[in-house]
């Protein structure tokens, strides 16, 4: 007996998470490791090691061991002017290697600050070379380092907008391939940059491709996965990103030269050239764009690989093809994200959730780093903590946060998002009531906040892919990613509010996160629900009702009730 099936029913029929999908996930997860490298590499390549100005008459050699030379004597938190930015007007009476914290503070008060004429002397205990040491991005030039990081984050924002729209037009697979190619080429180029400005430009381009690959790999996995396993599209890729987070610590420990490290994380990207032959297109996207024969070929291939071959008489419902052959047909654009009531509500809330999750995540990392810094400044260095171990621990903290979402997402997307945002927001607010001398408790609370925010970030990408319909899904995720990247640009600015009040940043993003938790209640529950393919699917009867009253029914829906073809079996 023949019956029509929508695409989610097709996936269920051929296997929503069979061998075909599992192999696909291998292909979309492998690049995530390199993406983590590119995202976090500036922690090491942009690091500023201990440094002093060489006098024209005297060279101040830095001790080889941190036991003899306290890191806090030459670098302070938040780029405060200190001993490292002082041009020596005379040789201090106390030998540099014997300075303690209080002596250094007294010395810096009397030290003459000016332009360093003799050049900079950098410690090579931790880093052999960095971007900062090669181009002297310290003191008066320190802001260039920060600006470079902001420009890179702006690249992610540009990529989210640019490649989000291009993917809806040219397909997820094509944009992934283009993104990986550009990323590897410009990443390798950055390792040979002749000056800082060219380096920043090359990193900006790499940043745009990060968004291209992350978004489209995620959507490609989502559109090939049945509703029961759809959450894996976000969580599994997050695991591989977390693995890259952890692995980078070891790689950077072994490679202390920034150019060699930049080359080591970029060159392997060329190995993905074989994706041209193995990475499939999205059958759902092909159908939504009337490329039905290609879609059916892929569906048959997936069915055969999953051990559930389709019957030979399967064909695309011809009535659908007649309906879509209109003389003038509306093209879906980014404007459609806010054109209709429910889409407008869902889109605005999703955009806000992306911003309110990203800013606290970045600020919390900085907050914990500053607490660790102050601990080291007070000579609490017997724990053996260093930048490589700290990076490793931060990566490990994210793994349980991503793991717990595997158990909560199956029950509810909406409640899971709400709960983790609430945990993150409350933890942020609680830190302001902890005295400064209880820094360990404040650090633990900050890490709890980071745990909640990390979990919410894992959920929001799964959630957003299900809230937006197929015809504008990539545009919706692209705009969401753009908002998240905007949060990345804003995070350092918000952290500057510490100059007004040390608790201001925590209060601000704690309240913003709690507001996001409340707004989540207005979103639809998407767990175990079929993906919407058209805006009409999202709006339901509201479009028809508004059409009768205000004649605002889009041309797309006048003759075609759905852009997702029915299948006759």
Can you say where each PLM-predicted feature lies in the sequence?
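Cytoplasmic helix-loop-helix junction between adjacent transmembrane helices
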Residues: 196, 202-239, 250
């Amino acid at each position: 007996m023949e019956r029509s099936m929508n695409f989610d029913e097709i996936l269920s029929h051929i296997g929503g998470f069979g061998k075909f999908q599992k192999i696909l996930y291998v292909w979309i997860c492998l690049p995530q490791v390199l993406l983590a490298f590119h995202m976090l590499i500036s922690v090491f390549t942009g690091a500023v090691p201990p440094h002093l100005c060489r006098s024209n008459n005297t060279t101040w050699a830095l001790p080889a061991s941190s036991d003899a030379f306290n890191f806090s004597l030459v670098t302070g938190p938040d780029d405060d002017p200190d001993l490292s930015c002082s041009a020596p007007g005379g040789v201090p009476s106390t030998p540099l290697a014997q300075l303690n914290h209080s002596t250094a503070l007294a010395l810096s008060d009397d030290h003459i600050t000016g332009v360093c004429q003799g050049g900079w002397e950098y410690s090579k205990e931790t880093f052999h070379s960095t971007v900062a040491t090669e181009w002297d991005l310290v003191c008066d030039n320190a802001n260039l380092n920060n600006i470079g990081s902001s420009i890179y984050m702006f690249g992610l924002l540009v990529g989210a907008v640019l490649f989000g729209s291009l993917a809806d037009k040219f397909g997820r697979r094509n944009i992934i391939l283009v993104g990986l190619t550009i990323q590897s080429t410009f990443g390798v180029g950055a390792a040979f940059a002749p000056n800082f400005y060219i380096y920043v430009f090359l990193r900006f381009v790499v940043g745009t491709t990060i968004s291209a690959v992350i978004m489209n790999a995620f959507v490609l996995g989502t559109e090939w996965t049945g509703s029961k396993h759809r959450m894996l599209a976000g969580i599994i890729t997050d695991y591989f990103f977390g693995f890259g987070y952890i692995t980078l610590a070891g790689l950077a420990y072994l490679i202390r030269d920034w150019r060699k490290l930049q080359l080591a994380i970029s060159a392997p990207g060329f190995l993905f050239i074989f994706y041209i032959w193995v990475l499939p297109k999205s059958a759902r996207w092909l159908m939504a764009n009337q490329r039905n024969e290609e879609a059916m070929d892929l569906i048959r291939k997936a069915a055969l690989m999953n051990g559930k071959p389709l019957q030979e008489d399967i064909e695309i419902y011809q009535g659908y093809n007649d309906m879509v052959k209109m003389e003038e047909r509306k093209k879906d654009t980014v404007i459609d994200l806010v054109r209709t009531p429910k889409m407008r509500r869902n889109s605005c809330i999703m955009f806000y959730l992306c911003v309110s999750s990203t800013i606290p995540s970045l600020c919390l990392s900085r907050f914990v780093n500053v607490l660790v810094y102050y601990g080291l400044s007070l000579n609490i260095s017997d724990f053996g903590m260093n930048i490589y171990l700290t990076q490793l621990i931060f990566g490990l903290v994210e793994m349980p946060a991503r793991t717990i979402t595997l158990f909560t997402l199956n029950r509810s997307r909406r409640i899971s998002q709400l709960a983790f945002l609430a945990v993150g927001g409350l933890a942020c607010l609680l830190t302001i009531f902890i005295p400064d001398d209880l820094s360990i408790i404040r650090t633990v609370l900050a890490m709890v906040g980071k745990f909640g925010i990390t979990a919410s970030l894992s959920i929001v990408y799964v959630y957003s892919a299900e809230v937006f319909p197929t015809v504008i899904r990539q545009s919706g995720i692209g705009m969401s990613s753009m908002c998240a990247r905007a949060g990345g640009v804003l995070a350092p600015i918000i952290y500057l509010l510490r100059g007004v009040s040390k608790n201001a940043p925590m209060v601000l993003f704690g309240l913003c996160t709690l507001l996001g938790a409340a707004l989540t209640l207005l979103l639809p529950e998407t767990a175990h629900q079929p993906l919407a393919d058209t805006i009409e699917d999202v709006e339901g009867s509201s479009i028809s009702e508004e059409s009768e009253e205000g004649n605002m029914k889009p041309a797309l829906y006048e003759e075609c009730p759905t852009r997702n073809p029915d299948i006759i079996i």
